[in-house]
Amino acid sequence: MYPSIDELDIVPARAVIHDAFEEHITQAPGMEHIGEVVNGRILPTPGAVLIAAERLAGEVGDLVVVDVGGATTDVHSITDGSPEVAALSIEPQPHSKRTVEGDLGTYVSAAHVVEMLAEQERPVHLPPPLPTTRAEIEAALTLTHFAAVTGVQRHAGQLAHLYTPTGRQTVARGRDLTACRLVIGTGGALTRLPGGAAILADTRSKGGGERLLPPAVARCVLDRDYIFACCGALFAHFTADAVLALMRRSAGV
């Protein structure tokens, strides 16, 4: 991953991880017959969404994709950051990056999200997997909002201050999202509950903080057809233009 000092090359490692996943997923409970019904590569959902995000960024520019799922919240960013922050950076970052938060989900890990909200004195009842009543939907939205905002906060880097013999020095650590002018939401929670775009709006910077979040002017849209993960897999079998057309229509970009 580090061929030389300050040179970060994660693409080969990512390919090896995908190969290992494809080899071992067929040994997981309930997945032993997947090879009988799939005649192509088996991609993990986060990997497929990252492929889709990379291809779309090539068309529309720097972006963030937030995928709030039942078990995890995955945040993908395709950006080199802003020149201003790059001048302060003290560590290399890849052009495309994904973080997977295993404690932020709206189904498998929902109880833990409820516990974290309670610690912040924001009590909420655990909603059912498919909320139907107004109270259940509001509870699910609270969990989704917390997962999305917390996931992006964890994904983003921040400014820090070091004290040196020559005085205080400001540096940038971690991922710089300040050049991302597009935030896209995917996953069942954001795309099927009402108010997904409004939740994404709260992942943006409100100004004045040291966290390197997407700017307040970033456009927030949804993968309305919930197809980004599928499209990531489709790039291996169909022309890029055709798959990108599906993605752009779904997100309205």
Regions inferred by a protein language model and the residue ranges of each:
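Nucleotide/phosphate-binding catalytic cleft detector across ATP-hydrolyzing
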Residues: M1-D62, L143, H155, L159, ...
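Flexible loop/turn segments at secondary-structure boundaries
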Residues: A71-V75, S82-E84, V113-V114, T191-L193
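A glycine- and small-aliphatic-rich helix-loop capping segment at beta-alpha/alpha-beta transitions
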Residues: T79-E91, L200-G207
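Extended hydrophobic-aromatic, low-complexity segments
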Residues: S77, E84-L88, H161, L193-G196
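Active-site proximal loops enriched in glycine and acidic residues that flank catalytic Cys/His/Asp
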Residues: D67-G70, S77-T79, V108, V152, ...
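Glycine-rich phosphate-binding loop plus the immediately following alpha-helix
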Residues: I42, L88-V149, A216-L222, C231-G232, ...
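A generic structural signal for short, solvent-exposed coil/turn residues
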Residues: D67, S96-R98, L177
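Gly/Thr-rich phosphate-binding beta-strand-loop-beta motif of the actin/hexokinase/Hsp70
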Residues: L56-S82
